[in-house]
UniProtKB/Swiss-Prot annotation:
Belongs to the AIM4 family. GO terms for cellular component: cytoplasm. Pfam families: NpwBP. Keywords: Cytoplasm. It comes from Lachancea thermotolerans (strain ATCC 56472 / CBS 6340 / NRRL Y-8284) (Yeast). This is Altered inheritance of mitochondria protein 4. It is found in: Cytoplasm. Its main location: cytoplasm. Residues 1-23 are annotated as: Disordered. The keyword Methyltransferase does not apply.
Length: 88
């Protein structure tokens, strides 16, 4: 295999496409469906909450361990949003 057919470890670290990022200065930007904070109704942009780092998950290996239950601080009468309730 010639040297031009593969990248060395140091080339891979400096590559702007490492870990699927477009550039290395990605901080807490929107990751859409790739974000661990993504929800199609509540957070379609995949933005991280204040104080948390946005990390993309590997869609082929990531598995939720349990169903996510929203915390409503004891309020039982708050209806969950649905796509039918969205305003045009």
């Amino acid at each position: 295999m010639s040297k031009s057919n593969y990248m060395s470890y140091s080339d891979e670290k400096s590559s702007s496409k490492s870990f699927g990022f477009e550039n290395n200065n990605v901080k807490n930007q929107e990751l859409g469906e790739r974000s661990i904070f993504y929800d199609h109704e509540w957070n379609p942009e995949g933005k991280a909450p204040s104080g948390y780092k946005n990390v993309p998950y590997n869609q082929y290996t990531f598995k939720r361990k349990s169903k996510v239950e929203p915390k409503l601080q004891g309020f039982k009468s708050i209806p969950f949003p649905s796509s039918e309730d969205k305003q045009p």
